Every structure is written in structure tokens, then in C-alpha cells.
Amino acid sequence: MIKIPPKAKILLIKLRSIGDVVYNTAVYTPLKESFPNASLTVLVERPSYDLVCDHPDIDEVLCFEKGSLWSQIQFYSRLIRAKYDVVIDMHEGTRGAVMCFLTLAPIRIGHKFAKRSFLYNAKVEFSDLEPKFPIDYQVALIKKIGVK
């Protein structure tokens, strides 16, 4: 288990599928209950924004939109300037892993099995999860920081 500061700035990255973002909402409340003084930011793509924007446990929602090179540079620059303490990549794709890395957060959590796992400094092994439902993977990631 990784110890994080009580007032940590936490970023959850979940891009792509709306259905996967729905699964991901199940981790917001346990995170806030475990770290009530933490700031929780969720990063999603535009189609999923409305699913999470009014969630009571989220302090901020960032919306990634593919656009011009300049707009992407501005977006990544914003991620770096935010100075997150903990970033959890719940996406499983290259873009989420790169975003996680570019935050320069001291704690970057992601999937151990991914070829891009070198971008994380805390990795979660999923081979022992039974059954392997999407929510099991999400929960395993937040357990890494002590969420029960």
C-alpha cells in the first residue's frame, strides 16, 4: 500500500468508452470516504463528461478533446501545472499512460501488464483477480493507495 497525504490532489484518468466510465464512477465515493480532505479530479473525454460532471464526490472534471497540436500542448501543460500528488490511470491505453506520466506526479499508478507500464512508478498486478469484471480492475487500482 502506498501512503498518500491526507489533502492529496488525486487525478483519475478514464478515457474512451462511456460504459467503462460508468463502471469507474463506483470508485469515486470510496476514494472520498478514504480521503475526505483530498481533491478529486476526473479526466474523461467529451462523450462521458455529462456522466460525471455533477457527481457529488468529484471536485473537478477535465475533458480531453482531440484537437489541434496547439490545443493538445495546452492541455498537457495544464496537467503538468496542476501538480497532482497521485494519478491513477484507469484507462489501459497508451494515451492515458502518457497523460499519467506527463503530470510528473510523485505517485503514478497503472496496470503492470501493459507494455507502457514503465510510465508508472506504482503498478498493480491483476493476474490474481477472480472474477475479472471491469469494476474489479478499478477497485484494485484504488486499493493500491489504501482505499477499502
Residues covered by each model-derived region:
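Catalytic machinery of carbohydrate-active enzymes
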Residues: M1-K148
